[in-house]
């Protein structure tokens, strides 16, 4: 599947452009074993001309034939190349960005390429229940690897200490896996465990 880059996309988002659009598909909770529960998911990556992608994923528990049983969760966030913020960048809050993008050309974006041949990225994701994650990682072509740098929990949130996520574009489909650590209650002394995985097809 050819990747179409929107004409109004800021150069800084070109490495992430293959994510843009809406995706739907299904997956399994846990390690995807025979008794693992099924879910369906709708994911969107959108842009508004600024140097980040807006992310939203809504999931539903399903039966093994894909019929929705009940809502599972929603998560939202922002994806961007990881770089030092400059005076021309917007924020914090409503402080406007300069009308001219900080990175104005492909050559300026290329200068951010790391020693592994990819680009460092940061991803922030918020969940119901007072939990927010800050991930750092790398995008290298159609592959993404993320690890939490910080997990923020509210005073009454469930235990949740770390996570990793991987994404890949394979034959036009978006594949992802999410591993989490939930503290001492997890097996193997609180280490990362398989949480969920899915295969999504692009619908727009």
UniProtKB/Swiss-Prot annotation:
The protein's Enzyme Commission number: 5.99.-.-
GO molecular function: heme binding; metal ion binding; peroxynitrite isomerase activity
Keyword annotations of the record: Heme, Iron, Isomerase, Metal-binding
Pathway: Nitrogen metabolism
Motif (GXWXGXG): 21-27
SUPFAM superfamilies documented for this protein: Lipocalins
Manner of cofactor binding, per the entry note: Binds 1 heme b group per subunit, that coordinates a highly solvent-exposed Fe(III) atom.
Cofactors named for this entry: heme b
InterPro entries found in the cross-reference section: Calycin, Nb(III)_bact/plant, Nitrobindin, THAP4-like_heme-bd
Function, as annotated: Heme-binding protein able to scavenge peroxynitrite and to protect free L-tyrosine against peroxynitrite-mediated nitration, by acting as a peroxynitrite isomerase that converts peroxynitrite to nitrate. Therefore, this protein likely plays a role in peroxynitrite sensing and in the detoxification of reactive nitrogen and oxygen species (RNS and ROS, respectively). Is able to bind nitric oxide (NO) in vitro, but may act as a sensor of peroxynitrite levels in vivo.
Similarity field: Belongs to the nitrobindin family.
Description of its domains: Forms a 10-stranded antiparallel beta-barrel structure able to accommodate a hydrophobic ligand in its interior. In fact, this fold hosts the heme group, which is located in a wide surface cleft.
Subunit structure: Homodimer.
Protein name: Peroxynitrite isomerase
């Amino acid at each position: 599947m050819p990747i179409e880059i929107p004409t109004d996309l800021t150069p800084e988002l070109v490495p992430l452009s293959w994510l843009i659009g809406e995706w739907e598909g299904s997956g399994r909770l846990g390690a995807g074993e025979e008794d693992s529960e099924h879910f369906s998911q709708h994911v969107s990556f959108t842009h508004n001309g600024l140097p980040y992608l807006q992310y939203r994923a809504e999931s539903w528990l399903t039966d093994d034939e894909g019929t929705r049983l009940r809502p599972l969760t929603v998560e939202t966030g922002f994806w961007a190349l990881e770089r030092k913020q400059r005076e021309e960048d917007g924020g914090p809050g409503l402080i406007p960005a300069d009308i001219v993008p900080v990175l104005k050309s492909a050559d300026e974006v290329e200068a951010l390429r790391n020693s592994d041949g990819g680009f460092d990225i940061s991803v922030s994701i918020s969940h119901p229940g007072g939990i927010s994650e800050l991930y750092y990682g790398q995008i290298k072509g159609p592959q993404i690897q993320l690890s939490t740098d910080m997990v923020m929990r509210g005073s009454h949130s469930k235990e949740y200490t770390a996570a990793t996520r991987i994404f890949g574009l394979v034959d036009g489909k978006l594949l992802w896996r999410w591993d989490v650590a939930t503290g001492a209650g997890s097996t193997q002394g609180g280490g990362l465990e398989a949480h969920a995985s899915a295969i999504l097809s692009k619908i727009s």
